[in-house]
């Protein structure tokens, strides 16, 4: 199958949450963002009577997961769709004991997909998780959006303080050439930045903003939260792993708005990765896990 690129984040913490409500019969775990199957594989390995539903829109990644999880084929079913679409179409003939959504982008997309997710690779700007779905690409955005649209996008979705500098540089560059690749865009951004050292690459926030916009990440999350809650069984848990403050704020505010006598927030503060996990899994540095339990049928 080739190398597995993605190490599941906060895996031990997810397992600990499952442990608090595990039932030996009929327990169903829904992995809304299956990826290469890391969380699901750990759950299936530890609990012999758990059944898993794995949801993954990218059919290339889904096939990699199926190969990795082949030994559990009798206890896992797959859905090749977006997680919000799955729950919109799902009929409530049964509810689920545990729903997990890891909102991070798979390492496969950064390292192999060739769609311009990473500024460390010289790839055509795209950033669509599933290009055949159509929709706007990062290439379209940086080459066609006007000044105000670009500034708002980069500032609001990336939290980029230097959004105006960056947009000015983008507009100047595209007077002469189209911005074709991720490395090309990264160079434009870096030249626009002040000549001082920063903790992160100057392109990080702009690339985040483009990816969020292209894949409708925040609105998809907002649509999904009430669907996830509605599909939990009594004492079921919804666990969500976020990777930036915009996602985390949406989840935090949604949980706070739930009726206290019907739901119990299990994470007064989000769970973050341990020092040890940060050492072997760099992707876990910004991960935050929030979880809520449903108290009624």
Curated annotation (Swiss-Prot):
GO terms for molecular function: rRNA (cytosine-N4-)-methyltransferase activity. It is found in: Cytoplasm. It comes from the Bacteria. S-adenosyl-L-methionine binds at residues 37-39, 56, 87, 102, 109. Pfam families: Methyltransf_5 (PF01795). GO terms for biological process: rRNA base methylation. Its main location: cytoplasm. InterPro entries: RsmH, SAM-dep_MeTrfase_MraW_recog, SAM-dependent_MTases_sf. The keyword Zinc does not apply. SUPFAM superfamilies: Putative methyltransferase TM0872, insert domain (SSF81799), S-adenosyl-L-methionine-dependent methyltransferases (SSF53335). It catalyses: cytidine(1402) in 16S rRNA + S-adenosyl-L-methionine = N(4)-methylcytidine(1402) in 16S rRNA + S-adenosyl-L-homocysteine + H(+). Keywords: Cytoplasm, Methyltransferase, rRNA processing, S-adenosyl-L-methionine, Transferase. Its EC number is 2.1.1.199. Belongs to the methyltransferase superfamily. RsmH family. HAMAP family: 16SrRNA_methyltr_H. This is Ribosomal RNA small subunit methyltransferase H. It comes from Borrelia recurrentis (strain A1).
